[in-house]
Amino acid sequence: MEFSPPLQRATLIQRYKRFLADVITPDGRELTLHCPNTGAMTGCATRGDTVWYSTSDNTKRKYPHTWELTQSQSGAFICVNTLWANRLTKEAILNESISELSGYSSLKSEVKYGAERSRIDFMLQADSRPDCYIEVKSVTLAENEQGYFPDAVTERGQKHLRELMNVAAEGLRAVIFFAVLHSAITRFSPARHIDEKYAQLLSEAQQRGVEILAYKAEISAESMALKKSLPVTL
């Protein structure tokens, strides 16, 4: 996926009120960007980081500029717009870049399912195979090349794991897919030190037949694409 029109560069001053960030452009203008990320954004929003932002042509938007990427002071690219996790995953499935999810003839998004009234991110179907339910999570928390999810306690994420376990129990295919959107990450684990319950449920889900996949995106200021499978340690 290529960014079109091209992203613009600025330097981060601060992120605040979760959804806003102040930046300064190379020519000295100060802008307020929309921040499309409700998470803690640990390591993704340090003062002085380079920010890459898009600009909407919707004149009715109060904040027409959207923070898309961080380029950390160590040089790592991080996609902070959580909407891209699903977009990149869908693109990779359709391109058959994810070997474990290839060979299906139909892809549906936001399908209602489960006892807890959830919506699955993607459902894959083929005549000769069980339906495949895929829940996507965006991974941006990194420590010494180790990627972690979640970056804060997530009851919603815990619910999704319970739903996937029920799917697997019905004889269908259930997949939790971690889209790693941080260029410095080389391996993935659940963030037991942040949400122990989630880590426990992820291990239980694997034991009950839920598949765990982690794929890393190649990220630059020009483009992004999920390319590489990463090792997962529970």
Swiss-Prot record:
UniProt keyword DNA-binding, yes or no: yes
DNA-binding region, residue range(s): 201-220
CDD domains recorded: SfsA-like_bacterial
Keywords in alphabetical order: DNA-binding
Keyword Disulfide bond attached: no
GO molecular function term, any single one: DNA binding
Highest taxon listed in the record's lineage: Bacteria
InterPro entries in alphabetical order: SfsA, SfsA_C, SfsA_N
Role noted for this protein: Binds to DNA non-specifically. Could be a regulatory factor involved in maltose metabolism.
Family: Belongs to the SfsA family.
Protein name: Sugar fermentation stimulation protein A
Gene name per UniProt: sfsA
